């Protein structure tokens, strides 16, 4: 089994992005699966072009995209990506689409094809906070997740794909009072065990509560 893991470069004035720093530290083999990582530009559309090129080159069985969600307290596998860009801030090339469909010929939304609840349980068993997230936002993270699943729908039907947000690293919150952070080693470990769950559960998931009341 081959798994491609992606990490964004820094954006929004940050000097580092924990997604990129974490994926760089992943071992090349996890739970018997071959793992490769790639850096993704935090740029609408260019991000998905880089992803598709790497998929064509590597031919992975699964894609796990990783992104920073500053302020979140744990690792959060995303349930769904919506067909909408609505950027609060410009991307790294100054693009700021507002209320713009990502793909005219795509679904209104795509659900993750990764075992998100098994991923959450695996992370929690390591003593790390994790929960299913029901919104990936409307910035480049949601954009890339949507594009990855669009590629599954249109071009790579045997591939699975999904996204997981991670918190700030501790050094990013030194001057951000009351903002959650996590050590890089814990972030890396959380991603590792999430990948273990992807390998173990393949086309199924745990039947556990992961919803919200509002």
Swiss-Prot record:
<dbReference type="Pfam" id="PF01470">
    <property type="entry name" value="Peptidase_C15"/>
</dbReference>
<feature type="active site">
    <location>
        <position position="141"/>
    </location>
</feature>
<dbReference type="InterPro" id="IPR033694">
    <property type="entry name" value="PGPEP1_Cys_AS"/>
</dbReference>
<dbReference type="GO" id="GO:0006508">
    <property type="term" value="P:proteolysis"/>
</dbReference>
<dbReference type="InterPro" id="IPR029762">
    <property type="entry name" value="PGP-I_bact-type"/>
</dbReference>
<feature type="active site">
    <location>
        <position position="165"/>
    </location>
</feature>
<dbReference type="InterPro" id="IPR000816">
    <property type="entry name" value="Peptidase_C15"/>
</dbReference>
<feature type="active site">
    <location>
        <position position="78"/>
    </location>
</feature>
<dbReference type="InterPro" id="IPR036440">
    <property type="entry name" value="Peptidase_C15-like_sf"/>
</dbReference>
<dbReference type="InterPro" id="IPR016125">
    <property type="entry name" value="Peptidase_C15-like"/>
</dbReference>
<comment type="subunit">
    <text>Homotetramer.</text>
</comment>
<keyword id="KW-0963">Cytoplasm</keyword>
<keyword id="KW-0378">Hydrolase</keyword>
<dbReference type="InterPro" id="IPR033693">
    <property type="entry name" value="PGPEP1_Glu_AS"/>
</dbReference>
<protein>
    <recommendedName>
        <fullName>Pyrrolidone-carboxylate peptidase 1</fullName>
        <ecNumber>3.4.19.3</ecNumber>
    </recommendedName>
</protein>
<dbReference type="GO" id="GO:0016920">
    <property type="term" value="F:pyroglutamyl-peptidase activity"/>
</dbReference>
<comment type="similarity">
    <text>Belongs to the peptidase C15 family.</text>
</comment>
<keyword id="KW-0788">Thiol protease</keyword>
<dbReference type="GO" id="GO:0005829">
    <property type="term" value="C:cytosol"/>
</dbReference>
<comment type="function">
    <text>Removes 5-oxoproline from various penultimate amino acid residues except L-proline.</text>
</comment>
<keyword id="KW-0645">Protease</keyword>
